[in-house]
């Protein structure tokens, strides 16, 4: 049973990371998305 919950947690973490990465890339490319808090946390300066 613990193995299943571990796999689910890994999947959730991967999904969250992918979503954050997509937002970060859009911010860097100057997309329509306003600079997210993640960009500020990573020390990326927005223009």
Swiss-Prot record:
Membrane spanning stretches: none
Domain of life, per lineage: Bacteria
**What membrane topology does the UniProt entry give?**
Lipid-anchor
Q: What single Pfam family name could you report for this chain, choosing any that match?
A: Lysis_col
Predominant localisation class: membrane
At which residues does the record annotate a lipid attachment of kind S-diacylglycerol cysteine? 20
Kindly list the residues that the UniProt entry marks as N-palmitoyl cysteine lipid attachment points.
Answer: 20
Taken from the UniProt record, the cysteine pairs bridged by disulfide bonds within this chain are: none
User: What is this protein's record name?
Assistant: Lysis protein for colicin E7
């Amino acid at each position: 049973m613990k193995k299943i919950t571990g796999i689910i947690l890994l999947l959730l973490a991967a999904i969250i990371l992918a979503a954050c990465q997509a937002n970060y890339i859009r911010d860097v490319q100057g997309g329509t998305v306003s600079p997210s808090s993640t960009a500020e946390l990573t020390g990326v300066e927005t223009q």
